[in-house]
């Protein structure tokens, strides 16, 4: 009986997570544009409230980006470790 693991799929999944993290910047910029368009809500684009909201939004996006990127790296590392272990075990049985 042969078991065929697709370690490349795990690596691809990790890469996809990291790519999605990178795409967050475009979403972040789009939200900032919308906030600036509606800046009257906070008292104008230059107001402390508006700038504070934009700053906090940036911090939140940074945390999400860092966590998603780190998770993608961990998924890729796990896939690589499984592939190496599988290869080592497989060669010891040969």
From Swiss-Prot:
Its main location: secreted. Gene3D superfamilies: ESAT-6-like (1.10.287.1060). It is found in: Secreted. GO terms for cellular component: extracellular region. It comes from the Bacteria. Disulfide bonds: none annotated. Keywords: Secreted. Belongs to the WXG100 family. ESAT-6 subfamily. Strongly interacts with EsxK to form a heterodimeric complex under reducing conditions. This is ESAT-6-like protein EsxL. It comes from Mycobacterium bovis (strain ATCC BAA-935 / AF2122/97). The lineage of its organism: Bacteria, Bacillati, Actinomycetota, Actinomycetes, Mycobacteriales. The gene is esxL.
